[in-house]
A protein has these predicted regions:
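Ankyrin-repeat and related helical/solenoid repeat scaffolds used for protein-protein interactions
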Residues: 131-192, 196
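Structural signature of tandem alpha-helical TPR/SEL1-like repeats
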Residues: 5-19, 41-53, 75-87, 108-121, ...
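Conserved alpha-helical positions within TPR/SEL1-like repeat arrays
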Residues: 29-40, 62-74, 97-108, 131-141, ...
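N-terminal coiled-coil initiation/transition segments in long coiled-coil scaffolds
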Residues: 2, 16-23, 29-33, 37
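Boundary/linker segments of alpha-helical solenoid repeat arrays
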Residues: 62-63, 96-97, 130-131, 164-165, ...
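Structural marker of alpha-solenoid helical repeat scaffolds
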Residues: 23, 57, 91, 125, ...
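TPR/TPR-like alpha-solenoid helical repeat scaffolds
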Residues: 2-5, 172-176, 196-210
Length: 210
């Protein structure tokens, strides 16, 4: 019942936003918001078209570029996501979210070094981006920067102690530092928060503690 109601509400919002775009065809924000609502409704191609229109009207709209990049990433169009996020960074070097997105793209492409560069820039501009600290932990572990991994994991947990993946990554970082008791504590916390901790990791941890 509530799902149908939500869909009806979304359809109503879309209709209102479409009307606003007809009435104000030159409004960047109208097209931008329409794109976001289309995305929420799962109408991805229309979301792309609306955000592209917003960027056509204002090529310097960093927010529209970032949202278009996130949309492309979700659609698996990684190279397009890369291009628009690079465009956003060129316009605004201080955009933490654009740097974070580029880090995720390069991590997805398997380039841990490049990912780390962008993640480092992201938290320099906004130290409270918890997902970036979480991703940085994973990248540092891939590169076997164990001290840095522990530092990044600690920052994530400090920001959001009840973020399940932050607790999991802290457990893994502690494991690689040889602090198995602390690793067990944080793995248990991740499990309690509903995170599907890798069974192989739990087995390895149990073996070290036995």
């Amino acid at each position: 019942m509530s799902e149908n109601s939500n869909q009806e509400d979304l359809s109503k919002v879309i209709a209102e936003m479409e009307q606003k775009c007809i009435e104000k065809p030159g409004s960047v924000m109208a097209h931008h918001h329409l794109g976001l609502v289309y995305r929420k409704a799962g109408r991805l191609d229309e979301a792309v078209a609306a955000l592209e229109k917003a960027i056509e009207l204002d090529p310097f709209s960093v927010e529209s570029l970032i949202n278009l990049g996130a949309l492309y990433f979700d659609m698996g169009k990684i190279d397009k996501a890369l291009a628009v996020n690079e465009q956003a960074v060129n316009i605004n070097q201080a955009s933490a979210q654009a740097h974070a997105n580029l880090g995720l793209i390069w991590q997805n492409k398997g380039d841990a070094v490049k990912a780390l560069e962008y993640y480092t820039d992201a938290v320099r501009h906004d130290p409270k981006l918890v997902t970036v600290w979480i991703n940085m932990t994973s990248v540092h572990l891939m590169l076997r920067n164990d001290d840095k991994a522990l530092e990044a994991a600690g920052e994530a947990v400090k920001l959001e102690p009840d973020f399940p993946m932050a607790q999991n990554n802290l457990a893994v970082a502690l494991y690689y530092k040889g602090d198995y008791l602390a690793a067990k504590k944080h793995a248990d916390k991740a499990l309690a928060l509903g995170y599907a901790v890798d069974q192989r990791f739990l087995d390895a941890l149990s073996q070290e503690l036995s």
